[in-house]
Amino acid sequence: MKAGCSIVEKPEGGGGYQFPDWAYKTESSPGSRQIQLWHFILELLQKEEFRHVIAWQQGEYGEFVIKDPDEVARLWGRRKCKPQMNYDKLSRALRYYYNKRILHKTKGKRFTYKFNFNKLVMPNYPFINIRSSGVVPQSAPPVPTASSRFHFPPLDTHSPTNDVQPGRFSASSLTASGQESSNGTDRKTELSELEDGSAADWRRGVDPMSSRNAIGGGGIGHQKRKPDIMLPLFARPGMYPDPHSPFAVSPIPGRGGVLNVPISPALSLTPTIFSYSPSPGLSPFTSSSCFSFNPEEMKHYLHSQACSVFNYHLSPRTFPRYPGLMVPPLQCQMHPEESTQFSIKLQPPPVGRKNRERVESSEESAPVTTPTMASIPPRIKVEPASEKDPESLRQSAREKEEHTQEEGTVPSRTIEEEKGTIFARPAAPPIWPSVPISTPSEEPLEVTEDIEDRPGKEPSAPEKKEDALMPPKLRLKRRWNDDPEARELSKSGKFLWNGSGPQGLATAAADA
């Protein structure tokens, strides 16, 4: 804590309230050892000197009333070294606990709250031992586990054959048994076994019938009775002089074995073996009653994390480690072998925009060029721009421009000349049908020239497919290297017949 800050000291004698080292929020504020508000309220409720400030509500289980809210806020501010603390801030902190299900506001009563002990802390109420003989576990894990913040020393139950007497739970006998438990060396070894979480402790044979005799032997009327299966598992010794306190004398003797490791009040209040309702506290770290940083347990936890996707209903996170509870084997171990049977086939990447246009244009030009090989005159007369759809004309023109832009070997002067020849041409669409009629002598010559050149230029169907799949730059380079005549024609300005005949013609028509 900060220097010069007055702190409420924990009394050494009877009536004191002992916290383990790990009951403070060390993980969120290292070194400050801050106590949580609900711990502080329980601490005030345990002390006689604060009865005028805060007290248990009579006749209600776990309900308390704040008689002097300003004084409680002042005490809390002094404990936290915050002199500006008031009840508004404190009540906001209490409202935070509503969602955590630690406590809730009692409707219709001012400054009255109720702890959810029956749900939150454990199935049977945690009878807090207020004697100063309780031993604080020094080897507690640094994170909050599925265990209570308080330590409950077990009573002497080494001889399970002894019948439990009804008068055993008088105050004097309880005090005597508490002194025995603090003085006996064999009890200390048992405590150390519990703190270490040894596996032998879980398998210790306890006669369940003796604990049921204890249930029938002594009982208190106002105590809420739990089902028999819960009571033997979560029995706690303890006493408290106030008859209205929930920390009343337990009707069950504490057994030195099963589940004397406490259960966390801040997490899910009931262990998952009794309730399968999902809650934030159902993490694999907190589902077990006894946590240790064991590499085997860590491996088990990581394995359950990996398998939880495949079979969540069989995952170890839903089962705490209790003796005699059979968890079915995990099924996700079969998945690596199954996955090897199926080979993964990757699809080729989708064709880019340029390649897709080239494939479409080659498919368009293919049906047009095949009839030209068969009969020459229809090829020229079918070509007029009025019949050709403007979409394909625009597409081929765009393709031509991309050709010229991608070509790195052609100097910029030639590109400008080519663009000039294309855009300077004043021919309008009506002129094109008259071209074959006006120049009948020149046309057949050019057509035959084109047909002679075509076997070299125009590849067969499989070669066309290869061309379509080839990168555009490589295809352009290959065409450029294969056609010296086309190069010369384009340089001299006759750009129309640089590509395939009809395509070039259509391009010029579109650009005009």
Curated annotation (Swiss-Prot):
GO CC term, one of those recorded: nucleoplasm
In-chain residues carrying the UniProt-annotated modification N6-acetyllysine: K388
Feature: compositional bias, Polar residues: 158-184
Cell compartments where the protein resides: Nucleus
Region (Disordered): 136-222, 336-512
Cross-link (Glycyl lysine isopeptide (Lys-Gly) (interchain with G-Cter in SUMO2)): K381, K388
Keyword Calcium assigned: no
GO biological process: cell differentiation; cellular response to granulocyte macrophage colony-stimulating factor stimulus; negative regulation of cell population proliferation; regulation of transcription by RNA polymerase II
Phosphoserine sites (modified residues): S139, S159, S315
Superkingdom of origin: Eukaryota
Entry-linked PROSITE patterns: ETS_DOMAIN_1 (PS00345), ETS_DOMAIN_2 (PS00346), ETS_DOMAIN_3 (PS50061)
DNA-binding region(s), chain positions: 35-116
Biased composition (Basic and acidic residues): 380-406, 453-468, 479-491
Keyword line: Acetylation, DNA-binding, Isopeptide bond, Nucleus, Phosphoprotein, Repressor, Transcription, Transcription regulation, Ubl conjugation
Compositionally biased region (Acidic residues): 443-452
MF (Gene Ontology): DEAD/H-box RNA helicase binding; DNA-binding transcription factor activity, RNA polymerase II-specific; DNA-binding transcription repressor activity, RNA polymerase II-specific; RNA polymerase II transcription regulatory region sequence-specific DNA binding
SMART domains: ETS
Function text: Transcriptional repressor that contribute to growth arrest during terminal macrophage differentiation by repressing target genes involved in Ras-dependent proliferation. Represses MMP1 promoter activity.
Family indicated by similarity: Belongs to the ETS family.
Designated name of the protein: ETS translocation variant 3
Naturally occurring in which organism (per UniProt): Pan troglodytes
Gene name per UniProt: ETV3
